[in-house]
Amino acid sequence: MKNKKPRKFITQAPTLSLLALALLAGSVQAEDIGERTDQGTAMLASLQSEQGLIYLNADVWLKRQGATPLMTRDQLRERVLARGERLFIDFSAVTDQSERQQTRKAMEQLAGISFDADWVLVSGYKGELLFTPLGGVDDPAFYQVMERVESLEGQGKRHKRSLTQPPAAEAGLPHVAFYLNVNRKISDAECTFPRSRTWSRGDRLFCDSPNISLVYRVNLERSLQFGNTGSATPDAKIVRISLDEESAGAGIQLNEDLTWSENIADYLLLDGWARDYATDAIAQDYRFSIEASNTKAAVLKSLPTNLNSKYEHREISGFEVGVTGGVEVNKDGPKAKLEASAKFSQQRQLAYNTQDYRVERSAPSAQKVSFSWVRDQYATAESLLSSKTATVWGMGYDVDHNRIQPLSYKGFVPNLDVIYKAAPDETGSTEFKIDSSVNIRPIYTGIYKHYYVVGAHVSFQGFEDTDKRRRVTASTSFKVDWNHPVFTGGRPVNLQLGGFDNRCLSADANHGLSAVTCDETSAAQSFIYDQYGRYVSAQDTRRCLDGNNLGQLQSCSLSLGQRWEWKADSDALSNLSAHQLLGHDKQSGALGLYDENGNPQNVSVRTLTSYTRIFGPPASH
């Protein structure tokens, strides 16, 4: 049974123009790209409104292999950030593992990353894309994100007014930035414990609407080596994962307030346990771990270090990267080769207020780091008691709630910053796994009656039953492709053919080259002019423009045929092997190498170049 709500429907458009018009139409109706799956239909049917929702069946990517991409990264940012729309990607119909990998690759080309999830929701958050991998049909994160987004019109207007733009220097740094939403409801079963530790009185729920809701901030970028030994910036591919003051999310919640229940001995008692109490759950510890799946990536820097309890501090976690062009664009602009010419400090604001918890950092390997906020002040049930003994008439609940800071059970938001590095020539991919967990513990205390013929008194005792604790973890992961063009460190440029009014060099899925209408958001038309003078394809960084075969991109090498140099004060691009200029037929656009003078009348050797924006922020509105 299909959802009957009004929406557009796109299967395979016969031409790019029709598809592009549909993608950029900006209608408030729901829009489908591909047939909805039964599971996708069921998830969306429960929504009150599908206004501003784009449904994408990942199977469409398989059917369109070799075709022009459905959507560029810049178009995705435009629709989600400027117009307030949301993209729901459904992978559930792709069950074959090799085909699943192909669809993940397509998502990497669109967004820079991919997830091992059946569904991924893409929305906006603080001026960047927010990715929410969904763990199942009934994952509450889906509904929470959808409900958080108000009407399309209001959302779009707000984003246009308050879109968070990075500082000018950072905006010029080639990087891919996004937020990762980690949202997990803690089930009733996970927070249900015995009502009494002394008697069999059944179980009860020790939490009230518990959940883990965190927003991690992720940056993918390249640092080029710059400076002298000792102070030089690293020559490395960088992945930075943070929970800072610009991200963090709602935090980890167990309870809004702490309540307690009482159990009384139901038999005549002279000496023994008279009563026990069960107080709502708090966190014995919070733990956060980040791990790379292979040795391609290693931890370069991580914060916080070990911290004492009752520690309050704010700091800036800075990291210097070597960049090309510095804060200002290189004087040669897009004709400049890739080389480090300045340092740029990328900063994160971190705040610590440990209160009852100490922080322990652990790095069991070069690929893994973990941070634990471990209860240190009043860490045991015994230490929470305000009295040790009393008369038999003084029996009652004795846990001092003033010794339990709210951080122990509600709104806990950590701050941390982890930077991974990979070799500058690293290839393949790495999965980054993030675990966010809380160790839930009820507080059990009891009253023991001591009888000694001539009198009696009671003692208050606390219990540390480790079997009555439970760790709940929210796990997520994302895959990074080390061949992504952002890791070259260069700003992408195009090659525009001067014999036409508006034609640029473009590569197809089989690496064939042709002249097409210029599009500054197209990865197929984007190249990195690297330190060797090669034009490396941003669509596939293993392929380069080769003067020995100008009809098709070739595997990159250091051959002179792949090295190019701009003639001074001109629009002429010279090949270092042939010592001839790149030219093209003014009718067909076919490329060739020609002498500087005496060329046929139908040939132009004028080539222009300008920056493209395949992973930069959208144009201002």
From Swiss-Prot:
The lineage's top-level taxon is: Bacteria
* Record InterPro entries: Hemolysin_N, Hemolysin_N_sf, Hemolysin_pre-stem_dom_sf, Leukocidin/Hemolysin_toxin, Leukocidin/porin_MspA_sf, Ricin_B-like_lectins, Ricin_B_lectin
Swiss-Prot/TrEMBL keywords = Cytolysis, Hemolysis, Lectin, Signal, Toxin, Virulence
Q: Name one GO molecular function term.
A: carbohydrate binding
Signal peptide span: 1-30
What family classification does the UniProt entry report for this protein? Belongs to the HlyA hemolysin family.
What does the protein in this record do? Bacterial hemolysins are exotoxins that attack blood cell membranes and cause cell rupture by mechanisms not clearly defined.
Designated name of the protein:
Hemolysin ahh1
The record lists the organism as Aeromonas hydrophila subsp. hydrophila (strain ATCC 7966 / DSM 30187 / BCRC 13018 / CCUG 14551 / JCM 1027 / KCTC 2358 / NCIMB 9240 / NCTC 8049)
What gene does this protein come from? Answer: ahh1
